[in-house]
Amino acid sequence: KVDKRLAEQGISRLEIGREAFIEECYKWREEYGTTIVNQIKGMGCSCDYSDEHFTLEPAYVRAVRKLFTDWYHEDIIYRGKRIVNWCPHCTTAIADDEAEYVDEAGHLWYLRYPLTEPVCGLEYLVVATTRPETMLGDTGVAVNPKDERFGHLVGKTVKLPLVDREIPIFADWHVDMEFGTGCVKMTPAHDPNDFEVGLRHNLEVIRVIADDGHINENGGPYNGMDRYECRKAIVKDLEEQGYLCLLYTSPSPRDKRQSR
């Protein structure tokens, strides 16, 4: 709620700094805290309302930090890289219940990925994506182990369009051979399913989108572009170079905390 309030003012938590952001959180608590407690009471929750605490109170914060530190040193928890819902406006993670799917003007692009060396007359595979800009971070193409159409290609490689990087073709049960073309581009850094598949096959993780939604240094000539501008540029380049096949409309997730 505080992030949304700041966004309505055209600012972000990063611009005002940690201390100022916490002050805004306290203001929000002063404004809505009583209402929230009354709602909890209205639901019949049996609590000791004489001993209320705010999660940003210094003592509370210290206790949480100590607990997590202790758990880390006791190997109860660990810190690792995982895919999460992310808002580039707030530059914060988004809970699953704060992400919603809206049917807007999104597309599903079908792209040609040329084989490094033609096999039995086949020169390319066709993959589909709703986010062409993520192809800059592709590190593999997966097929179903039982798919006879592509079994002879497992172990071969394709050349990633625009990037000219060789990436492997491999088999994984995650692929539904009845859906789409039966070939799935793998971008472990930008898709939760791809990330899990990547762990199983030791795929390289190449992140191409920064926290603020712009393409990073791994994006080559697209470095610094907003992801949507990059999408347009990549689609244009793919079409001009003969790699674009088809496109369809598809829904996309959006952070419902953001009104823009």
Q: What kind of region is each of these model predictions?
A:
Residues 214-218:
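Short acidic beta-strand-loop surface patches of small beta-rich interaction domains
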Residues 42, 46-47, 53, 57-212, ...:
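NTP-handling and nucleic-acid-processing catalytic cores
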Residues 248-255:
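Conserved small/polar residues in nucleotide/adenosyl-binding loops
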Residues 78-81, 243-247:
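Acidic/polar loop patches that form or flank catalytic/metal-binding clefts of enzymes
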Residues 219-223:
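Catalytic palm subdomain of template-directed nucleic-acid polymerases
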Residues 1-69, 73, 197, 224-242:
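N-terminal Rossmann-like or analogous alpha/beta NTP/dinucleotide-binding catalytic cores
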